[in-house]
Amino acid sequence: MKFNKIVALALALVMVFALCACGGGTDTTNPDDSGSTAKVDTNTVSVGAVVIARDDVPTDEIYAFVSTIFENLDAITAQHAKGAELSLEAAASVKGVPYHPGAAKYFEEKGVKVDAVKEGAGNGTASALSFGTGGESGTYYAFGGVLASFVSGKSDCKVTALTSGGSQANVEDLANGNVQLAFVQSDVMNYAYNGQRLFDSPVTGFSVVAQLYQEQVQIVTTNPDIKTVADLAGKKVSIGAAGSGVYFNAIDVLNAYDLKESDISAVYQSFGDSAESLKDGKIDAAFIVAGAPTTAITDLATAGSVYLVSLDDSHVQSLLAASPYYTAATIKAGTY
């Protein structure tokens, strides 16, 4: 009997050591009320990921770009999971900024009508297209590279994906002729077109190609005690590059919880730098706005447990009421 007790104790100790050894995992969850981790959905808001083009890109080039993508969604999805989120209805749903004639032509052939078409666009000379995406640790770059490679290989439209500083930089590069195509957040696109927030005057020399998927506002932390946005008060938080789309999304969310920028210790970093700072313990949390799963968070999760902070329903509704660019969103448990 005494021997059996010794064996049982030994087995229990082995299990404890095994659990301790596995403590830092890739479990991206958000903490429940007890402070432990729970595999649950994360409620948040999202903005659209939109491809825009310079007005002088020829109609045939944009038609080839859009048609090649939407006629080959299964093959694209096999290369990147975001392909599964694309639909004709969502692609043609943008309002407030007119569509490029090449995109409108394809959508209308498929029986989907866009809200407005840019007059006088599409009359430039055909050439290879540079596609401004985003930083290497974001979804824009990864998915943009897949789209560029696929379109170039399956059509006469030749596209090269380039890294960039994100939405605002992409609009500026597009306006300056450095790129012909670009990814932008839907809210930043409208700010540019109307000369608001990030932009001192309207930027109107572009038109919509397609809205491809939703970009979730993801609040990431390695601290399980940060359970709500209110818990960010007094913490060191990365809120994106100063003046970026992420910055304004972060400010909107903080304001919804009656927090000002001065109520946190704000740092202004890219997705990749935010992930590195979280891993090194230099910051407490970070706002990352990108289609989930996002490379920066996935990579961070390989180094230890990370948590997504959920927005409660009342604050989601406040954000929806305050801005026409937000949509309620859910990041499913197990995404990371």
Describe the role of every protein-language-model region.
Residues Y99-G102, V114, K154-T163, A169, ...:
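N-terminal secretory/targeting leader peptides
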Residues M1-V40, D115-A128:
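Short, low-complexity disordered leader/linker segments with a strong preference
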Residues G145-S149, T160-S201, I219, K227, ...:
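Pocket-flanking alpha-helical
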Residues T26, G35-V57, S186-V188, Q196-R197, ...:
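Pocket-lining segment of extracytoplasmic ligand-binding domains
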Residues E89-Y106, A126-K154, Q214-D280:
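Bilobed "Venus flytrap"/periplasmic-binding protein-like clamshell domains
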Residues S46, D60-I62, V66-L129, D273-A275, ...:
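An extracytoplasmic/periplasmic, membrane-proximal ligand-sensing/linker region
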Residues S46-G48, A126, G138, D156, ...:
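Extracytoplasmic
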Residues S130, T160-A161, Q180-Q185, Q218-V220, ...:
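Structural recognition of the beta-strand scaffold that forms the well-ordered cores
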